[in-house]
């Protein structure tokens, strides 16, 4: 179950997302839900999206979901060369951290341009865990 993440992202709408590692692939299911459906989910712990609920049945075995953590990400992004630079400020479990991402159409080209960005601005590269994993690890240390 540690290879599963369920989140609800709120920006101009609410989007429930399941991310689950299956072999070498990452499965991702996204579904827009209303604020009312989200609030009901927080109250009753029943996943409102049937496809996600069915996908997690083998893990949950009828148990309800509880919200035990909040993770907020504030992102600024801008075009750079053939991609987009994104700078994230993440807040979770009494922690604030920052992350630099470079989104590109090709992996190799993006990797090359990312290395150029890091060198150009004197940034020390440090491979990071996914945000949700960092937040979960911080929560485990706290309890």
Language-model segments: residues:
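Phosphate-end processing signature that detects enzymes handling 5′-triphosphorylated RNA
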Residues: 1-143
């Amino acid at each position: 179950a540690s290879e599963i993440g369920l989140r609800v992202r709120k920006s101009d709408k609410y989007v429930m997302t399941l991310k689950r590692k299956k072999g070498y692939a990452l499965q991702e299911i996204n579904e827009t839900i209303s604020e009312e459906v989200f609030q009901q989910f927080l109250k009753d712990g029943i996943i409102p999206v049937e496809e996600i609920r069915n996908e997690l049945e083998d893990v949950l075995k009828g148990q309800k979901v509880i919200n035990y953590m909040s993770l907020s990400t504030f992102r600024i992004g801008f075009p750079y060369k053939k991609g987009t630079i994104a700078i994230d400020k993440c807040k979770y479990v009494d922690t604030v951290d920052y992350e630099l991402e470079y989104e590109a159409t090709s992996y190799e080209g993006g990797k090359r341009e990312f290395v150029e960005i890091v060198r150009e601005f004197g940034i020390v590269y440090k491979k990071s865990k996914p945000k949700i994993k960092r937040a979960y690890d911080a929560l485990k240390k706290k309890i």
